[in-house]
Amino acid sequence: MKKTRTANLHHLYHEALPEDVKLTPRVEVDNVHQRRTTDVYEHALTITAWQQIYDQLHPGKFHGEFTEILLDEIQVFREYTGLALRQSCLVWPNSFWFGIPATRGEQGFIGAQGLGSAEIATRPGGTEFELSTPDDYTILGVVISEDVISRQATFLHNPERVLHMLRNQLALEVKEQHKAALWGFVQQALATFSESPETLHQPAVRKVLSDNLLLAMGTMLEEAKPIHSAESISHQGYRRLLSRAREYVLENMSEPLTVLDLCNQLHVSRRTLQNAFHAILGIGPNAWLKRIRLNAVRRELISPWSQSATVKDAAMQWGFWHLGQFATDYQQLFAEKPSLTLHQRMRQWA
């Protein structure tokens, strides 16, 4: 009898884990991973020990690239995404994540907080957060376990102050030269060990790399400070409104929601909702609702854990009752017919 796969494809897993369960990546071989991706669902699964759900917001064929190094309780990576995304993320527990965006190009957001040239994102492990990233976006990531920070606290002059910021801030303002130095160090490490991954099998090499990374991080964090956002209060409120709207849509998958439903649930007028979507995303709430639902259908079609056996099953589950129009809208967003998406899953996981 074939085993049935089950999973929630549209929400992250938040159940409390026993204290003796450790999810910290710790490896001595297979330290380096490189991947090229052509689908947002596939790309969201690339980062070791993370939970992620991505929604593709701009139409086109997605292209992503990902490189990571796994050290002893430290994770370093570079992520490139070709199209604008909305991301739900959850880092492995008992750690701190640092997101270091490029200093040039259109900025991304963590929650309602913009990430400019002198800013980095940060979140404790086990805490869900949301990223919004534009087309053609590169971000570096560093994840350090709390145990490493505790054992190596000397790399911070004032660890209590820094830890307080890391636990309570979505983003930090840092000196541009410190951010640039860390960016260069991480890029060089990724390039070097991607070409010679076997070098990281040596404990001495891993130790030197880890220690130098901690020193570079310490230099940046010592002079970091909370951000006083330049974005207007109204725009920050709009971003929070969009986040609440998405959660409501995904929590009510049994019925096709409308703009009126969103207004009633979020206690805002239609004009406020329109203003929020146009100010932040440049599209109306109707178009956004359709894209979020199309992304949900795509996860149902492509995931090996899906229970949907046909395109019709997946489409009807998310309120697309006119299958011809659904297929047209799906192909416009993902540059691919829904039947092809399902065929790829069946061929790979049959």
Curated annotation (Swiss-Prot):
Pathway the protein contributes to: Amine and polyamine degradation; ethanolamine degradation
Signals that turn on the gene: Part of the 17-gene eut operon transcribed from a single promoter, positively regulates its own expression, induced by ethanolamine and adenosylcobalamin (AdoCbl, vitamin B12). This is the last gene in the operon and has a second weaker promoter that is constitutively transcribed at a low level. Subject to catabolite repression; expression is substantially lower during growth on glucose than during growth versus succinate. Catabolite repression is overcome by adding exogenous cAMP to the glucose growth media.
A Pfam family it matches: HTH_18
SUPFAM superfamilies: Homeodomain-like
InterPro entries linked: AraC_XylS_family_regulators, Homeodomain-like_sf, HTH_AraC, HTH_AraC-typ_CS
Location of the DNA-binding region in this protein: 260-281, 311-334
Protein name: HTH-type DNA-binding transcriptional activator EutR
Annotated source species: Salmonella typhimurium (strain LT2 / SGSC1412 / ATCC 700720)
